Amino acid sequence: MQDYLQPSAIIDWQHPDILQLAAELAAPWETPAEIAKACFEWVRDQVRHSVDYQMNPVTCRASDVLRYRTGYCFAKSHLLAALLRANEIPTGFCYQRLSIDDQGAPYSLHGFNAVYLPEFGWYRIDPRGNKPGINAQFAPPDEQLAYPVRLPGEAEFEPIFTEPLAIVVEALQAAKTWDEALLRLPDVSLERAEEYSLVPRLRVGRRAG
């Protein structure tokens, strides 16, 4: 479990700004579930999704996501993990493969989090950001992610990674603008998923972001 608490180059939760916000969000609460919900809702609602708001820069490192208050789904999951780890709550990274336009190809990975709660075990949460048609919530033990999996070629993957996938980090760091990133969203075909340790999860959960 300690691996899900570690700082890294991307999940730089020891940054002073992250530590300060993590403490502020946790202050009114006592239980890990209450603190996790507060952090989740802050990232979901206060960090603007890059595409929804057509915002630059393209962020990746948790402290940069906090600084600029914008990011793709992946970047938002990086900040949420940092805030939760700063509060000593084990947090990892999960992925889906989703149709970008709900009509089949092209596809993209979609990133979100799993948090370990003593009362419930591992619980998946998606801080992507709500809008009409998307309503991700924190309501354990029920998972309410942004996108259910429903089309051929889509999948939700079982592993909970301790660090973001390298293919995700590389895609974010290579793009200079939100629209450039949109043209090169990371994808892994189901045929190659095992090469990235992406084993499909046996549950049916909608689209990429």
Language-model-derived ranges and their functions:
Residues D17, E24, T31, Y53, ...:
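A generic structural micro-environment signature
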Residues L21, L25, S77, A114-Y116, ...:
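A generic structural signal for ordered secondary structure
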